[in-house]
């Protein structure tokens, strides 16, 4: 599996703001928006392009555009915060949705929503979720996408835990990972250590629905 850890001072500074327990919802959202933009920029580096004649006010130049923009698939809830950064970089991308919550007792993903094109063959797919912890939610999402014919999938995560990275690498699914950091471990509650807490709660406040 191809793993790209984005090593850049601006990415590191935004990730630090997200990790900082003193950052309130507003500061966390702003840092996530900036870091999300940087990660999508890196993830899109190898997307196929096409060239065309672009008429400038002075002459004609060679223009470049994406040949086939990817579909952006956030894993709800926390992944919703990454839609705007992704669309700011790729405004003509389509968006699908996968809803996944975590059972706080078993730490297993609980799916509750699936809104995806039926046929994803030949499409690039960017799955966006701020955190890759155990890998359970992401693996479930990847299987849904692969079942629809997706063979070019990029997972974009702000922070990844080594156990989740290992689970992804051993899955045999067609995925590459773009992340800002790989943290070493999970605690007994399956939170990333040192991590950044619960990204959904820090974006939107505590989840108030029981599974």
Swiss-Prot record:
Binds 1 Mg(2+) ion per subunit. The magnesium is bound as Mg-PRPP. GO terms for biological process: UMP salvage; uracil salvage. Its EC number is 2.4.2.9. It catalyses: UMP + diphosphate = 5-phospho-alpha-D-ribose 1-diphosphate + uracil. It is an enzyme of class 2 (transferase). GO terms for molecular function: GTP binding; magnesium ion binding; uracil phosphoribosyltransferase activity. The keyword Cell wall biogenesis/degradation does not apply. 5-phospho-alpha-D-ribose 1-diphosphate binds at residues 77, 102, 129-137, 198. Uracil binds at residues 192, 197-199. Belongs to the UPRTase family. This is Uracil phosphoribosyltransferase. It comes from Corynebacterium aurimucosum (strain ATCC 700975 / DSM 44827 / CIP 107346 / CN-1).
